[in-house]
């Protein structure tokens, strides 16, 4: 008799929905679970990467200014004048039977021919470096295209440029996976997942080796001048190795241009990531207290070499990065720290023995 009366329900009116709470249920984590908690990964500065890509594209495209055209026209006119004067000297020497002058003309012709040949070779290698950027843009378009007929020829051209033989197991798996009903996006995606990782794995090994050598060299070397020369030499060697792996033959000017583009890309997008990666380890593992100053400098030099290799890999790679296949600086960071700590432990244990 003490229960309250329930409200009246009128069936002629629509039922009222009970309001649901907007709050989620409470979750309680144990102490063991809280230790293994890992924060979610955050995308790495899309704005900075976009600015870096725009700067690289602008640097790759030749600037067609008026002064450039005037200089090129003047050089062409000077070259034509030199050739004409050389032909006239040769004719006069032949008519007067001046064999000494004729020999000098022949030697000059050989020197000019060698110079023209080297200029043409350098221009062709520089054009090949620029062409790689256009191939990357074409691959990006094919990865978002539903057309048919271009993907297979494009991928076969990339395999030929990289020196991958037709009997290579990765290329054979790609041939077995594609069929006529697939569009260009699917064919290029299969190439990126089956064939391209073969070259990427070789480039990663080269980056790891060169970064480890830079780290150990800086950690044990007492001379700053020797350190600078060694790092510069090894970084240039690393760029040459990565370019060769991806089928790009570098000349003098193309090597300088690629090195400039890599440094430009690092200046745009690499500084904040490098500081974050180094700071993460120093704060979490207290490396500043465990390692010496030279060892810390070695880790910094190794990370810079790894960053240089990653950007050179990105510029020489014929395909854009897909999903999460881009190498992370943190992967090389952990490897460098482990190798350096192992080397320091061996050096400390050897005098005791």
Swiss-Prot record:
Signal peptide: none annotated. Residues 91-99, 234-353 are cytoplasmic. Residues 1-19 have a biased composition (Basic and acidic residues). Residues 1-35 are annotated as: Disordered. The chain crosses the membrane at residues 70-90, 100-120, 213-233. It is a multi-pass membrane protein. GO terms for cellular component: plasma membrane. Keywords: Cell inner membrane, Cell membrane, Membrane, Transmembrane, Transmembrane helix. Residues 1-69, 121-212 are periplasmic. It is found in: Cell inner membrane. Belongs to the UPF0283 family. NCBIfam families: hyp_HI0043. This is UPF0283 membrane protein YcjF. The gene is ycjF.
